[in-house]
């Protein structure tokens, strides 16, 4: 289910697992956060690599997940390098075949 894929996504992100993340992404995925905007799978993967290379560790704690059809609203606490905590809301949309087509991240 897409709900399980959301949990996998945050696990793979916390583990900096580019290959597994790539498997979840649609070819035409878009990613927008407070620093970057990327379109298509290769560019989104590169954006993730850049994030992972800029930190020693990154850990995603899920506070709450709500869903409406193929869209998930995820309240998160992201801990960088074991100490810096950021409140984030991700809005993640899936396509009809269960691939992530859009990620929008908002910093709280």
Predicted regions and their residues:
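Short, low-complexity N-terminal intrinsically disordered segments enriched in polar/charged residues
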Residues: 1-19, 23
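Hydrophobic pocket/interface hotspot
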Residues: 9, 20-22, 29, 44, ...
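A solvent-exposed, acidic/Ser-Thr-rich amphipathic alpha-helical stretch
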Residues: 18-19, 26-68
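Short acidic/polar mixed-charge low-complexity motifs
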Residues: 37, 82-86, 99
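Short beta-strand segments that buttress and anchor functional surface loops
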Residues: 73-81
């Amino acid at each position: 289910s897409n709900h399980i894929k959301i949990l996998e996504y945050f696990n793979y992100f916390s583990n900096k697992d580019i290959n597994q993340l790539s498997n979840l992404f649609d070819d035409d995925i878009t990613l927008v956060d407070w620093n970057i905007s990327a379109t298509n799978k290769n560019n989104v993967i590169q954006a993730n690599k850049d994030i992972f290379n800029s930190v020693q560790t990154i850990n995603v704690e899920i506070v709450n997940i709500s869903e409406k059809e193929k869209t998930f609203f995820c309240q998160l606490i992201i801990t960088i390098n074991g100490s810096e905590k950021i409140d984030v809301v991700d809005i993640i949309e899936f396509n009809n075949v269960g691939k992530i087509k859009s990620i929008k991240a908002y910093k709280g």
